[in-house]
């Protein structure tokens, strides 16, 4: 999994909603520093946090993970 791509997608979805990292971390009940580490690609979220992020941001897991999983290259 490409942690940096996952982090960029979480960051983009958060910004589209007009939220700060502090706001999203409050909604997901996680530490703002941990969220910033996820968004920078330094950390991978736990499954529980990943699900909470998807629900809060109203995005599918596929949106956040597409192209970051092994074998996800387009099949022409």
Regions found by a protein language model. Name each.
Residues 29-44:
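Recognition helix of helix-turn-helix/homeodomain-like DNA-binding domains
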Residues 39, 49, 68:
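DNA major-groove recognition helix of helix-turn-helix
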